[in-house]
Curated annotation (Swiss-Prot):
Family: Belongs to the glycosyl hydrolase 97 family.
Keywords: Calcium, Carbohydrate metabolism, Glycosidase, Hydrolase, Metal-binding, Signal
Reported function: Galactosidase that is able to hydrolyze the alpha-1,6 disaccharide melibiose and the synthetic p-nitrophenyl alpha-galactoside substrate (pNP-Gal), with retention of the anomeric configuration. Does not hydrolyze DNP-Glc or pNP-Glc.
Organism: Bacteroides thetaiotaomicron (strain ATCC 29148 / DSM 2079 / JCM 5827 / CCUG 10774 / NCTC 10582 / VPI-5482 / E50)
Activity dependence on pH, as recorded: Optimum pH is 8.0 with p-nitrophenyl alpha-galactoside as substrate.
Cofactors demanded by this protein: Ca(2+)
Subunit structure: Monomer.
Protein name (record): Retaining alpha-galactosidase
Enzymatic reactions: Hydrolysis of terminal, non-reducing alpha-D-galactose residues in alpha-D-galactosides, including galactose oligosaccharides, galactomannans and galactolipids
EC number(s) given by UniProt: 3.2.1.22
Signal peptide: 1-19
Length: 662
């Protein structure tokens, strides 16, 4: 009997193996591999240098007709390709990027495909619909299964009720990171992307997505009793009502029983697992940009990245003037004068220039003569950017864009979307296209992480989806912004530019910070704020403080004003997630190097071998000897430097340094 049972088991195992098909795809350097298994379900795994870091993880898509792409799938064909090309990357961390991968397409009966790509620093896949009949996507499974109880650094959704995921889908995508074992992650809270899992031995896995057009964004949740992160998507809105912040949002009151509508052949978003063996390689990955759809714009000549003098963070505070400051023409003329004197490209009119609670951007408050401000700014070679709440912009988008473009406005900062369901991600692309039509740049605030849109529409220069410096207006000292700063280059910035809004001139050493809405400060040192203009990527980059504070600090201000916001080349020289990072960036023949640390004092050695074979002159801003007590303390010094030089810099707790080499 035992012999018969054994034989039957052998036969069943043989039949099961015969029913399964497996395909292996390796990165160009051979270090990363994924094995895709087609059987009762569709799974893939990832190995790095022969070690499995992602165990077979299921992927599928359930349609409203009952079809499940990924269950008992019938393969109809395969194709492979290898690509090694340079692509243009305007208004980014480098002027061009290498797109180097091996690809595998699996074609299935019933008009659907799955495409896999293996890069040297990650594995990505996406579903593709080839059919012409419309349908609804009920659910998509994009789970991540790990071989052990690894440590993850995740941003939880802050809004909504515990366990009520539908209430959590309305959120601002802003939070610090929680680091814990997979088994100890909060199962009542959604996690938004990107997030990082530490696979040990230096290997980290950053999960994100790209080409997120007209499809809901991906969230993950912790699974009970498994080393697994499970996928979640916001359902399609069934009923929305105007409300939220100053009546500028559309609140979802009822949901459909599906997540997306599909009415034609299309590509679905790329699911990306960035996999690197060093933290500095993680911070340097370009996969989110590379996997965005190519540019749909032919003329980019009018797009002008740059810095912007910002009003809201400093609460329109000026001193030494003979008028009452606030949302009025005299205040904005002072901001324009400051921008012009320092070569700052833009001034933004943040919330307050349009009549409150009307959600109508054609109604301007009586204290503002917008045409006069636009003309005054133009006479001083400064562009005007207008803030707009989501609903006010969306409801009359073309008229708003046409009217203000004709007036001479240069772009919009659109805020308070706070959703990433299919309706909202479709809006992002429509807004980008409409702004491009009228030659307007776009900053998407109050939105999710970048996911390839800035490649498809390069006029979209920045995205929020980051727990930026605005949080220091109200956050308690228990919020460790300094720690967060040395996490985001390895997590949030993996997905693209960040509207972090640095540049504070009031700088608090540890223990001295307190929230102040009208006269806010940063955590950490002055030189940290300077360094953030190099370490963080923001093609449209705010100067958050008041012109009055900048004019009291001319040396720091002049240095900030000359730092480019887009680059020809970027190199992450060194770094460890959560501790420190040092980044070098080149524009033309000039290099900038920025470094920041956590609350630990640190001695950094900068290897200058990235320089060319000639002599250079360096200007260094470094923490002063008393920066551990007074965050504003710094020292500026100049000296010659060569390619074979090594520069040693001491960073105070919460400190940083910024270096210009030319």
């Amino acid at each position: 009997m035992k012999k018969l049972t054994f034989l039957l088991l052998c036969v069943l195992c043989t039949l099961s193996l015969q029913a399964q098909k497996q395909f292996t795809l390796a990165s160009p350097d051979g270090n990363l591999k994924t094995t895709i298994t087609i059987g009762d379900r569709l799974t893939y795994d990832i190995t790095c240098n022969g070690r499995q870091i992602l165990t077979p993880s299921p992927i599928s898509m359930t349609l409203d007709n009952g079809t499940v792409w990924g269950e008992n799938a019938k393969l109809s064909g395969t194709s492979r390709k290898s690509v090694d090309e340079m692509i243009p990357s305007p208004f980014y961390r480098a002027s061009e990027l290498r797109n180097h991968y091996n690809g595998l397409t699996l074609r299935f009966k019933k008009d659907w495909n799955v495409e896999f790509r293996a890069y040297n620093d990650g594995i990505a896949y996406r579903f593709v619909n080839q059919g012409k009949k419309p349908f609804r996507v009920v659910t998509e499974v994009s789970d991540y299964c790990f071989p052990s109880d690894m440590t993850a650094s995740v941003p939880y959704v802050k809004s909504g009720k515990d366990g009520d995921y539908n209430s959590q889908f309305f959120n601002s995508f802003e939070n610090t990171y929680t680091t814990d074992k997979l088994s100890k992650l909060n199962k009542q809270r959604l996690m938004f992307l990107p997030l990082v899992v530490d696979a040990g031995d230096g290997v980290k896995v950053c999960i994100t997505e790209s080409d997120l057009e007209n499809y809901p964004g991906l969230y993950l949740s912790a699974s009970e009793g498994a080393n697994r992160l499970s996928s979640m998507h916001a359902p399609y809105p069934k009923r929305t009502v105007q409300g939220g912040h100053n009546q500028l949002q559309m609140l979802v009151k009822e949901h459909e029983d599906y997540i997306a509508k599909v009415d034609k052949p299309r590509n679905f978003p790329w699911r990306i697992a960035v996999v690197t063996t060093t933290d500095k390689d993680l911070a340097a990955t370009n996969l989110s940009y590379l996997l965005g759809a190519p540019s749909r714009m032919s003329d980019l000549s009018w797009i002008k990245p740059g810095k912007v003098a910002w009003d809201w963070w400093n609460d329109w505070n000026l001193d030494g003037v003979d008028f009452v400051t606030g949302v009025n023409n005299p205040t904005y003329k002072a901001y324009i004068d400051f921008a012009s004197a320092n070569g700052i490209e833009y001034v933004i009119l943040d919330e307050g220039w349009a009549v409150n609670l009307q959600a109508d951007l054609m109604q301007v408050v009586k204290e503002i003569d917008l045409k006069e401000l636009v003309d005054y700014a133009a006479s001083k070679n400064v562009g005007i950017i207008l803030w707009a709440g989501y609903h006010a912009f969306e409801r009359d988008m073309e008229n708003v864009c046409r009217h203000y473009a004709e007036m001479g406005v240069k772009g919009f900062k659109v805020d308070f979307m706070d959703r990433d369901d299919q309706e909202m991600t479709a809006f992002n692309y429509r807004a980008a296209e409409m702004c491009a039509k009228y030659k307007l740049i776009l900053d998407l605030h109050g939105t999710h992480k970048p996911a390839g849109l800035n490649r498809t529409y390069p006029n979209v220069l920045n995205f929020e989806g980051v727990n930026g410096l605005e949080q220091m207006k109200w956050s308690s000292p228990s919020v460790d912004q300094v720690k967060y700063d040395v996490m985001i280059p390895f997590i949030r910035q993996v997905s693209g530019p960040m509207d972090y809004t640095q540049g504070a001139m009031r700088n608090a050493s540890k223990g001295n910070y307190y929230p102040c809405y009208s006269e806010p400060m940063s955590q950490g040192t002055r030189c940290r704020q300077l360094a953030l203009y190099v370490v963080f990527e923001s093609p449209f980059n705010m100067l958050c403080d008041t012109p009055s504070n900048y004019m009291r600090e001319p040396e720091s201000t002049a240095f900030i004003a000359e730092i480019p916001t887009v680059w020809d080349e970027s190199i992450v020289l060194d770094g460890k997630m959560g501790e420190y990072i040092v980044t070098a960036r080149r524009k033309g023949d000039v290099w900038y190097v920025g470094g920041i640390t956590d609350w630990s004092a640190r001695d950094i050695e900068v290897d200058c071998s990235f320089l060319g074979d000639k002599s250079y002159h360096a200007t260094l801003f470094k923490d002063g000897v008393n920066a551990h007590r007074a965050g504003r303390d710094y020292k500026c010094e100049s000296f010659p430097i060569k390619k074979d030089g090594k520069l040693k810099v001491h960073l105070a707790p919460g400190g940083g340094f910024a270096l210009k080499i030319k």
